[in-house]
Regions:
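Alpha/beta enzyme core
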Residues: 1-234, 242, 252
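Extended, intrinsically disordered, low-complexity segments
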Residues: 16, 238-281
Length: 281
């Protein structure tokens, strides 16, 4: 965070995604562009297992996926912790992630059955009280062995249809409680509410990291996000969203043609897949 104007994070739900993020680098003028780390998304973790995004996949299962990624990559991983669960359980989650080398967890200030934030007010979204969520942050911070692991608070006020002022009140309280950063989330396609939040937050906290997930306001360039005061941008679900349509096309082609030849245009050559992972040949 201190070394770059903005940190670029991409979703990874398995080791192959991790390898792409680890190794992909492109030339842009005089500079090289690459990803700085990975996002372990609860949405893509659960969807890739054929389960709903309601915290149905437990920590033990998610850690197995994370270990697969950790075995073949070196870049930092941010863990999507959903609501964090009960305070008593959250402390064990923090210890497990810290012990296994994960860099940070982001938890959202909601209670009850988790529903994906991008449903907005179309699904029941119940926010925790400020005091209740602050207690969770404090408990997590007290459970840490080192100062390296980050606990980042995700503020759902805008998702719940509340004003920016509510999001700011919560953000200030969470930082006071010990949060190492704040993530502000919104379903608004313009991004204007995010911009308003960032400028207001920066007036009080010029150095506390701000995290955004521009899934709905994807037209905004990283340079502009940086000018708002954003430190970390997470592309939270794009690897799975890219993979699923390609798999459906290949499967549909085989059904339509009763052979695999036509599906070849959607597939990489078999020789390349055999040589993709070092040690296979």
């Amino acid at each position: 965070i201190k070394a770059k104007p903005i940190v670029r994070i991409l979703e990874a739900h398995d080791g192959l995604c991790g390898l792409i993020i680890e190794n992909l680098e492109i030339k842009k003028g005089l500079k090289n562009a690459s990803f700085d780390g990975m996002w372990s998304s609860s949405l893509t973790d659960s969807t890739s297992k054929g389960k709903p995004d309601i915290e149905a996949v437990d920590l033990t299962t998610r850690m197995q996926d994370l270990n697969n990624i950790l075995e073949c990559t070196t870049k930092p991983i941010i863990f999507d912790g959903d609501t964090g669960g009960k305070i008593e359980h959250f402390v064990f989650t923090v210890r497990t992630l810290e012990r296994n080398g994960i860099s940070a967890i982001i938890i959202e200030d909601k209670v009850g059955l988790k529903k994906n934030s991008l449903f907005g007010t179309d699904a029941v979204q119940t926010q925790d009280s400020i005091e209740g969520f602050c207690n969770k942050i404090r408990a997590g911070k007290n459970a840490l062995i080192t100062k390296d692991f980050m606990i980042i608070s995700r503020i759902e006020s805008l998702i719940a249809g509340k004003p920016v002022s509510d999001a700011l009140e919560r953000a200030f309280a969470y930082v006071e409680a010990g949060a190492d950063g704040v993530m502000i989330h919104s379903k608004n396609k313009s991004g204007e509410d995010i911009k308003e939040f960032c400028f207001a937050f920066r007036e009080k906290h010029p150095l506390v990291p701000i995290v955004v997930v521009p899934t709905t306001y994807s037209q905004i360039y990283e340079e502009e996000l940086c000018s708002w005061g954003v430190n970390i941008v997470i592309y939270a679900n794009h690897m799975l969203r890219a993979a699923y349509p390609a798999m459906v096309k290949a499967a549909t082609s085989i059904l339509e043609n009763e052979r695999a030849a036509e599906a070849g245009e959607y597939c990489m050559p078999i020789k390349e897949i055999l040589e993709l992972i070092p040690g296979t040949k």
